[in-house]
C-alpha cells in the first residue's frame, strides 16, 4: 500500500510539473511579448487593437503588487514589494482584472512577473508603498502582508556566488530575503498567486528563482489552484511557470534544478544570439542551434534576444539600440523551432535606472503612435516594428514544422525552410546575397513580410516568385535597410 501511494504521489508530482510547461496558447499562436511597465488599461487596448489581430499569444506584465516608492521612480522599484495589494503605477485591481478579461477574450494570455524571493530593501524610516501601505524594511516589518522579522532569513550579504547558502539565503542586492520554507510565508505567497489565478491569469514569470530552494518552489507551485475555467481555460489546467535562473554554465545553483518545475529563462540563448549577429560568431554555426549549443530542451526553455535586465548591461546582448542586427536576430529567433519565444517591448533609456515615460506628477503615460503605428513618446514598442510583428505571423504560419533545406555560404549568409510553409534568408556579410535558393514553398508569388505586407492581393515590399521546383531568386543587399527576408504561405499573392 505504501509503495502504491508513493508511486501515485510521484506520478501526480510529475504530471503537475509537466503541466506547468504549458502556456495555454490559443490555436497556432506561440509568441509572448513583454510589455514592460505598461499600464493595465493600455495593455487591454493593445490586446484588442493590435496583439490579438496580429496573432500574439500572450503578454508578460510587470509586477502587479504594491511596491516601494523610490526617488525618481526607477523601473526597479517595481521589484521591491511592500505588500500583495494589487495597486501599482500600472493601475489598481479593478483595472488589472478588466485587462486580464479583455485580453483573454481576444486570445491573448496574461503572465505576471511575480516576486516570491524577497520584499523591499533597506529604507530609512517608514517606507510608503504605491497603495499607501507603510512598512519598515530595515526592521523587516511589512504589516500590509503581514510579515515580521521571523519570516525572513537572517541578514547576510552575497559575496560568493559559488556558495549555495549565500545565493539562496542571503540578501540579493540588499532585498529582504523571505524564508520560503516557513508555513506562513508559503501560505501568503500561495494566497497571492491564487488571487491572480482567480482573476484569470495564465501563469507566472518567477523573478530571482535561483535564489530560492527548488524544493520550496515545488511546494508552492504544486499547492496553487487550477486556472480559472471562466476565462476559457480547460478544466484542471495548471498555471504556466517560467523561472528566472541566470546560469552561464558554471553556476553552483543550476538551471537543471528548476527545469522540471516549469520553463527556465535560457540566458545563454540571449548571449549567443547576440554574439552571432554582432559578427563574433559565423551564422553558419546556427544550423545546430538549440540543444546542440548546450541549451535546455526546447519545451523547458524560455527564449529571448534581450530582456528588461540584460538590455541595460554592456556585452554581447543585442537591444533596440542596434536595430538592424536586432531585427535579424529576432527574425532568426522566431523562425527557428526552438524554445518558448518571448519578444521585448521596451521604453527608451539612457542609463540603467531610467524610469518609464512619465508626466510631471510621475504618472506613467500611455504610448502614442504615428501614422505607421510605431510608438513616438518614449516608448520603443519593438513589438510594433513591422519586421518583428511580421515574424510573429511567420511563426504562427509555420507552427509544427521542422527545419529543412538549410543553406549557408560558409560564413554569414544563411537560409532555411520550415517544412513547406515558410522560408527565411539572412545576410550579415558586407556583400550582397544573390542566389537561387530552394524555398520549399509551393509555386507562386510570395510577399517578403520583412520589407512590406500583403495588402489587397499585392506586396508593398519585395516579392519572390517560386517555380515548380520550389526555387526562387533571393536578393538581400549588404546595404538593404533590413538584412533578412521572410516568406510564408499566408503571404502568398
Swiss-Prot record:
Changing residue 293 to L: In strain: Seychelles-7 and Seychelles-8. Gene3D superfamilies: Glycosidases, Golgi alpha-mannosidase II. PANTHER family: ALPHA-AMYLASE. It comes from Drosophila sechellia. Chloride binds at residues 205, 307, 342. The gene is Amyrel. Ca(2+) binds at residues 117, 168, 177, 211. Binds 1 Ca(2+) ion per subunit. Binds 1 Cl(-) ion per subunit. One of its GO terms (molecular function) is 4-alpha-glucanotransferase activity. The keyword Aminoacyl-tRNA synthetase does not apply. InterPro entries: A-amylase/branching_C, A-amylase_C, Alpha_amylase, Glyco_hydro_13_cat_dom, Glyco_hydro_b, Glycoside_hydrolase_SF. GO terms for cellular component: extracellular region. Belongs to the glycosyl hydrolase 13 family. Monomer. The modification Pyrrolidone carboxylic acid is found at residue 20. The record marks 309 as: Transition state stabilizer. The active site is at 207 (nucleophile), 244 (proton donor). This is Alpha-amylase-related protein.
